[in-house]
């Protein structure tokens, strides 16, 4: 069954609305003489003592016992006779209910004074935790504590790993002072540490003593011209090329033709 909405007359007969009239000495005679009594809660200001509340203290200042609680305790000591539609009873729940009501009203009045109506209890509690002895803790902080420690950032390169640079082949095939010189070609590979160092030295020595040195020197020049496509960057000046040789950067041929010509040169059977 659906319960309909109670009228205001029935809602006004609840226990909470009767506490202010039922538990006062001055209003006991109203219960016997009159049937219609205004059952309203007392004002908030009457429940709370006029002692000011310090908003910066960690705990709220204790309030003196209000008139409302004193009247409840006095009414509990005496047995009040029921009159009309009201019933007087003595229960422990009445004191607990009135105490909860008082705390809620005190908190509502405190939020109204401090202009914190929209704020919740947790937010107000955090503000009081940050205060020490009525003065905010931030005033006692030293300058060293207020300094923000900057986080050290890891400096990482863009690629995170240094990859060998890819260079496009250039038309500049002159590499001084090695151009068209087999002895300089030997020095170039020996300074850089090429794996073909030993084979080139033996071939060059044999080609210088042999009568058919012209054919071998011609093949060496062709092979050297093919090996100019190196991984080393094509520098604009001669000094930069010389620095690359002194740093002993390992160079390898980029073209397949140069590799094939070197293999055929070193593996060919000379007559």
Swiss-Prot record:
Where this protein primarily resides, as one coarse class? cytoplasm
List GO terms (cellular component aspect). Answer: cytoplasm; nucleus
Q: Where in the cell is it found?
A: Cytoplasm; Nucleus
The protein's matches in InterPro entries, at most eight in alphabetical order, are given as: TF_Nrm1/Whi5 (IPR013734)
The keyword Transit peptide is assigned to this record: no
Q: Which UniProt keywords apply?
A: Cytoplasm, Nucleus, Repressor, Transcription, Transcription regulation
Q: Which Pfam families match?
A: Whi5
Q: Which family does it belong to?
A: Belongs to the WHI5/NRM1 family.
Assembly and interactions? Answer: Component of the MBF complex.
Q: What does this protein do?
A: Negative regulatory component of the MBF complex involved in cell-cycle-dependent transcription.
Q: What is this protein called?
A: Transcription factor NRM1
The gene behind this protein is: NRM1
């Amino acid at each position: 069954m659906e319960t309909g909405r109670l009228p205001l007359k029935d809602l006004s007969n609840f226990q909470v609305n009767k506490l202010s009239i039922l538990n006062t000495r001055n209003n006991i005679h109203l219960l016997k003489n009159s049937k219609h009594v205004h059952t309203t809660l007392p004002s908030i200001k009457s429940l709370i003592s006029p002692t000011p509340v310090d908003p910066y203290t960690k705990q709220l200042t204790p309030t003196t016992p209000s008139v409302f609680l004193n009247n409840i305790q006095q009414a509990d000591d005496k047995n009040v006779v029921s009159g009309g539609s009201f019933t007087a009873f003595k229960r422990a729940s009445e004191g607990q209910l009135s105490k909860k009501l008082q705390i809620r009203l005190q908190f509502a009045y405190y939020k109204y004074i401090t202009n914190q109506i929209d704020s919740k209890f947790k937010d107000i509690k955090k503000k009081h935790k940050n205060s020490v002895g009525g003065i905010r803790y931030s005033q006692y902080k030293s300058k060293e504590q207020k300094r923000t420690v900057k986080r050290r950032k890891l400096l990482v390169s863009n690629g995170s790993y240094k990859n060998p640079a890819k260079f496009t082949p250039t038309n500049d095939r002159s590499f001084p002072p090695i151009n068209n010189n087999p002895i300089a070609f030997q020095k170039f590979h020996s300074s850089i540490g090429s794996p073909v160092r030993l084979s080139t030295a033996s071939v060059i020595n044999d080609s210088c003593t042999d009568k058919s040195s012209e054919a071998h020197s011609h093949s060496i020049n062709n092979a050297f011209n093919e090996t100019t496509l190196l991984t080393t960057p094509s520098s604009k000046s001669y000094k930069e090329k010389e620095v690359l040789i002194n740093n002993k950067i390992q160079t390898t041929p980029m073209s397949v033709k140069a590799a094939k010509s070197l293999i055929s040169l070193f593996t060919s059977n000379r007559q």
